């Protein structure tokens, strides 16, 4: 946090809101006035009530107000009390507040005779942070399950410490009139809470109760109302018990839920949702229930119980569990929830609706996104009825509008700390604060830094908006494979700048010419140039277009997140990315330079992918390409023993490789994982991206420390030759060695490759990024080996190493160049 003391002439540069309604009086000679603006995530967290109570305790007069820049405070009294007030603003803030900076100045007193909360004002640039949705707090939970409380079993209970924020806010500043709660008029009791400084609902914008707030309804798949209020929830619970699929309108969108113990129900959900084998997440009624099925660490428990309440990827229990000395009976979860997967994505109820439903059921449920595969989740009940009626048997809906969707976030613990895999509910749109990781010449404090819109990648898309030193990263959008997904992407690209009244100076996009996000970047710039409506043509400049290489964006994201300076060696391993030479990169070592540029200092030996992108779903194609690169025409002899393909398919792929037709070159480590999984018989065809690589990771035998051989070919850039590794691997296959041993030796070899290249380059800072580093063992092994060699190693925590982090990296890399 930064504290800036301004001068009386310009106290922090902020313009005051209009004067409060408090009367003025004669000013004691020893009184001074303290003027403050607090920036950060300080709206929607009870910050103004906190300031009010603190001022009352210290008997200070003045006012506090939300502005589009943050929280504005004027307070006056004795200097020693003002200094105490200033210290306690910094140290005693509400639990969910994030204070980024405080600007303050001492002025002559004006004569306020009371302290009040003023109406919010729109003034200056919009720099206040929008808070994510927050999981239900313990105080609200007590009320929800207290039969004597007026909010007993009320599924929309909230206070200043919890409830919806990002999913309901329409504009800044954060006030009820700027949220989707604006049409719900508070009853007398709620109004009294809202205006009581001693109540935790003091200025809680979504405040509501059964008398005046939103309500539930249950619908048939034909849209007929079945029941209302609490009866609607019981209808949904009974449907789940009966093995039916329920579409539930949650905090940031719809979820599809079924009994996680009912194999037939889970299979039916897969069939209707067109989701063959990709794992489902499971919501448990309690932490004790999760412990019955899973081995969870202390950190994983904290994540599950946190205000963010993400899905946490944990290991399934290997033996019978005991809790408090008593044997715990595990739930018999359906096999098809996560087939052939030793891990399970688990979460706890995070909204009042989930808490009441899970109390009613008291068993785990599958809770997956309310959409068809590759489409965005539904947010409107009428749209959901159209899109999900072929999946759901019953709909549990409500009348609180969802302004923007936010899917469940996903994290896992790697190297003793959390790693984001999907950043959405609970985290978005909080910004990532970035400094200057490269020694780019300063533009000077008086020159405004460019505002950058980064539009991300094609898969696992998110977008980012850079304003000064903050980068606001959107919620997870997903793969841009359907028109519905692309429409959601376009809405987010418009929504994020609109919230902050941002005029875009630079649009950053990927270099891949066929990505929809890249085309959007070009169209955005072209449209801005051709129609600068409403702009002063003498001042306005069209936005620049910055195309950022895919893997360089990965490196920039990880450097920015860890706030490290160049030079640094980026190890970027993933499935695919458009390279500077027009080939498919994915096994890269990029040296970040002090001038904001990079050099490709090493990469994996290339091989061809017959059929191009089809290899993502058919690992056997990667295997054939690998064998052909290594053995030429003799590859077909090896393929008879290792690759499961029909003779017709083999003949077709052979022609592609020999004639180099639709068989692009790649250096991808992701495709190398796929090839190895195919060669050892684990997976010939995949139903979702990364499936073969995941199964190769899961197959690893824990106690094996041996590694396959490899060769480093000197040159510029250096080339990592996997040929010796594949020859040894095929020999192991011929000896009927177990897949567990082969997988372990393969993983260990990859970690050694990183160490050898890093030592040859001679760079102390090593950055691990790209989707391959979602692999827990690979990351932990690489980190351990690099540390053994006294190298400093960095990896992701707040931002996903996969393509969900690309937008952040694009914004950072573009800022270094502009």
Task: Show the residue positions of the predicted features.
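Conserved phosphate-binding/catalytic loops in two-lobed NTP-binding clefts
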Residues: 543-553, 765-766, 776, 782-806
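Intrinsic disorder/low-complexity segments
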Residues: 1-31, 222, 227, 315-332, ...
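Active-site-adjacent structural elements in enzyme catalytic cores
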Residues: 121-438, 447-508, 512-524
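Intrinsically disordered, low-complexity, mixed-charge
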Residues: 2-10, 28-217
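A contiguous, well-structured pocket-lining segment that forms one wall/lid of small-molecule binding clefts
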Residues: 213-215, 457-487, 491-495, 625-765, ...
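Active-site histidine-anchored catalytic micro-motif
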Residues: 559-629, 637, 658, 666-667, ...
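Short glycine-aspartate micro-motif
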Residues: 245, 452-454, 508, 568-572, ...
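Conserved phosphate/anionic-ligand binding catalytic regions in large, soluble enzymes, centered on
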Residues: 245-260, 352, 365-376, 512, ...
């Amino acid at each position: 946090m930064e504290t800036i003391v301004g001068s009386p002439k310009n106290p922090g540069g902020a313009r005051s809101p209009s004067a409060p309604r408090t009367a003025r009086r004669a000013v004691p000679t020893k009184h001074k006035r303290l003027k403050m603006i607090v920036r950060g995530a300080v709206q929607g967290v009870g910050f103004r009530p906190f300031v009010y109570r603190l001022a009352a305790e210290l008997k200070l007069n003045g006012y506090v107000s939300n502005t589009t820049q943050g929280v504005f405070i004027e307070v006056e009294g004795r200097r020693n009390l003002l200094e105490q007030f200033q210290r306690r603003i910094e140290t005693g803030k509400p639990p969910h507040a994030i204070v980024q900076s405080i600007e303050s100045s001492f002025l002559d007193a004006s004569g306020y005779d009371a302290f009040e909360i003023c109406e919010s004002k729109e003034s200056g640039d919009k720099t206040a942070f929008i808070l994510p949705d927050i999981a239900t707090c313990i105080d609200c939970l007590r009320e929800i399950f207290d039969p004597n409380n007026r909010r007993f079993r009320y599924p929309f209970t909230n206070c200043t410490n919890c409830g919806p924020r990002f999913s309901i806010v329409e504009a800044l500043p954060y006030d009820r009139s700027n949220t989707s709660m604006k049409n719900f008029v508070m009853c007398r009791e709620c109004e009294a809470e809202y205006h009581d400084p001693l109540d935790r609902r003091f200025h809680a914008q979504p405040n509501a109760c059964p008398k005046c707030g939103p309500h539930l309804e249950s619908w048939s798949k034909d849209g007929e109302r079945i029941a209302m209020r609490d009866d609607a929830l019981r209808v949904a619970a009974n449907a789940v018990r009966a093995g039916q699929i329920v579409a539930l309108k949650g905090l940031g969108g719809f979820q599809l839920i079924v009994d996680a113990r009912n194999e037939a129900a889970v299979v039916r959900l897969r069939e209707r949702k067109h989701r063959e084998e990709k794992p489902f997440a499971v919501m448990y009624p309690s932490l004790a229930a999760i412990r019955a099925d899973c081995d969870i660490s202390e950190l994983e428990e904290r994540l599950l119980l946190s205000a963010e309440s993400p899905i946490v990827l944990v290991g399934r229990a290997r033996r019978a569990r005991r809790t408090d000395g008593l044997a715990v009976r595990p739930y018999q979860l359906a096999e098809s929830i996560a087939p052939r997967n030793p891990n399970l994505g688990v979460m706890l109820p995070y909204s009042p609706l989930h808490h009441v439903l899970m109390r009613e059921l008291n068993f785990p449920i599958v809770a997956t996104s309310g959409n068809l595969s590759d489409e965005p989740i539904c947010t409107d009940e009428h749209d959901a009825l159209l899109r999900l009626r072929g999946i759901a048997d019953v709909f549990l809906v409500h009348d609180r509008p969802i302004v923007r969707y936010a899917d469940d976030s996903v994290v896992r613990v790697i190297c003793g700390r959390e790693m984001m895999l999907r950043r959405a509910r609970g985290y978005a749109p909080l910004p990532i604060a970035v400094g200057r990781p490269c020694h780019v010449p300063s533009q000077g404090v008086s020159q405004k830094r460019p505002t950058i819109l980064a539009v991300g990648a094609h898969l696992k898309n998110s977008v980012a908006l850079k304003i000064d030193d903050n980068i606001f990263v959107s919620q997870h959008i997903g793969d841009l494979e359907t028109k519905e997904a692309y429409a959601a992407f376009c809405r987010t690209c418009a929504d994020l700048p609109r919230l902050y009244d941002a005029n875009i100076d630079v649009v950053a996009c990927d270099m891949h010419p066929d990505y929809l996000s890249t085309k959007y970047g070009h169209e955005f710039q072209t449209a801005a140039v051709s129609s600068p409506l409403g702009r002063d043509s003498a001042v306005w400049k069209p936005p620049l277009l910055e195309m950022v290489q895919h893997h360089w964006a990965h490196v920039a994201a990880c450097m920015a997140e860890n706030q490290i300076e160049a030079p640094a060696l980026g190890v970027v391993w993933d499935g695919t990315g458009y390279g500077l030479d027009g080939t498919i990169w994915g096994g890269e070592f990029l040296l970040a330079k002090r001038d904001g540029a990079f050099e490709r200092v090493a990469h994996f030996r290339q091989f061809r992918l017959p059929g191009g992108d089809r290899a993502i779903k058919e690992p056997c194609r990667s295997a054939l390409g690998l064998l052909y690169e290594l053995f030429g025409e003799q590859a077909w002899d090896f393929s008879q023993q290792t690759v499961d393909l029909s003779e017709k398919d083999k003949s077709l792929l052979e022609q592609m490789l020999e004639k180099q037709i639709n068989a692009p070159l790649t250096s991808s480590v992701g495709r190398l994982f796929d090839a190895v999984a195919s060669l050892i018989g684990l997976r010939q065809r995949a139903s979702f991206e990364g499936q073969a690589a995941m199964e190769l990771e899961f197959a690893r035998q824990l106690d094996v420390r041996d590694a396959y051989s490899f060769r480093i070919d000197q040159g510029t850039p250096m080339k990592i030759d996997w040929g010796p590794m594949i020859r040894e691997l095929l020999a192991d296959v011929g000896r009927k060695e177990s897949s567990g041993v082969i997988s372990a030796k393969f993983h260990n070899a990859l970690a050694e490759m990183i160490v050898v290249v890093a030592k040859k380059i001679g760079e102390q800072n090593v950055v691990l990024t790209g989707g391959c580093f979602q692999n827990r063992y690979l990351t932990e092994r690489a980190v351990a080996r690099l540390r053994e060699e006294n190298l400093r190693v960095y990896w992701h925590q707040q931002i996903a190493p996969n393509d969900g982090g690309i937008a952040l990296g694009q914004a950072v890399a573009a800022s270094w160049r502009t």
